[in-house]
Amino acid sequence: MKNKNYMKISQEIKITFLTTIFIGIIAHLYMYTNRIVNHDAVFSVAFSGSTYTNGRWLLELMSKVAYLFNGNYVTPWGIGAITLILYAIAACLLVKTFNMKNKYICGCLGAIVVVYPTVTANNLYIFTAHYYAFAFLLVTLATYLISRYNYTMKNI
């Protein structure tokens, strides 16, 4: 028996989500299965680096929430899975925002989102990769809401 909620999801969204996950695994598998340590990862073992002082206030709040679930452990495969899921959801929101109907372009958009150079560079700092993926998701969500519901400053 098929799930009715799954059947309601459009084919474009399914293709975008699965392509983003699949291409992300292919592109970043080495980083997610190996612990590559850089200068910042050694220094920031027990905390997320400069937060409030650099204007990254949400990073501090999110790291406190993540501490409740994971402690101070940096597990690249776990963080990588969360990161890929967040980027896949963001890619699906981009498809909805631009009302894309071509399945090949939807798949390409998901692939571009997950292999973009900033995503690859963020994976070098794996202990904050999921925080920046969440930030990207929030940006795409805001863009989607503005385009769909025409929210502007004058409506507030």
Where are the regions that the model predicts?
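Extracytoplasmic catalytic/substrate-binding loops of multi-pass membrane glycan-assembly enzymes
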Residues: 26-44, 50-62
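Membrane-interface alpha helices of multi-pass inner-membrane proteins
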Residues: 154-156
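Low-complexity, highly charged intrinsically disordered N-terminal segments
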Residues: 71-92, 99
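Membrane-interface micro-motifs in multi-pass membrane enzymes
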Residues: 52, 56, 79, 83-86, ...
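Start-transfer (signal-anchor) and selected internal transmembrane alpha helices
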Residues: 1-25
